[in-house]
């Protein structure tokens, strides 16, 4: 099961007493700020959670798996996430759910 933005909004509504509209807007605003920062080439640091970084990948050789033809994989910028120590610790110590 995955946590969705709608579920995050519902949690804010229940825990903080925000209106459903305000809770939804808060979640959307948070993710929009993360997107904006990354689009502007900034690192996003969320204390106690982790860091979103941008990494430039160089062009490299690749192969079409269907035809075996050699094709170049173009250079691109990717987003990476490095979890913080607190998040790592909580995940490692959590009991698995089935």
Curated annotation (Swiss-Prot):
InterPro entries found in the cross-reference section: Hist_DNA-bd, Histone-like_DNA-bd_CS, IHF-like_DNA-bd_dom_sf, IHF_alpha
GO-annotated biological processes: DNA recombination; positive regulation of metabolic process; regulation of DNA-templated transcription; regulation of translation
Xref: Pfam families: Bac_DNA_binding (PF00216)
GO molecular-function terms, A-Z: DNA binding; structural constituent of chromatin
Keywords, in A-Z order: DNA recombination, DNA-binding, Transcription, Transcription regulation, Translation regulation
Presence of keyword Iron: no
GO cellular component: cytosol
Stretch list, region Disordered: 49-70
Keyword Transmembrane: no
Family listed: Belongs to the bacterial histone-like protein family.
The protein's role, per its UniProt record: This protein is one of the two subunits of integration host factor, a specific DNA-binding protein that functions in genetic recombination as well as in transcriptional and translational control.
Oligomer and partners: Heterodimer of an alpha and a beta chain.
Protein name: Integration host factor subunit alpha
Lineage, broadest ranks: Bacteria, Pseudomonadati, Pseudomonadota, Gammaproteobacteria, Enterobacterales
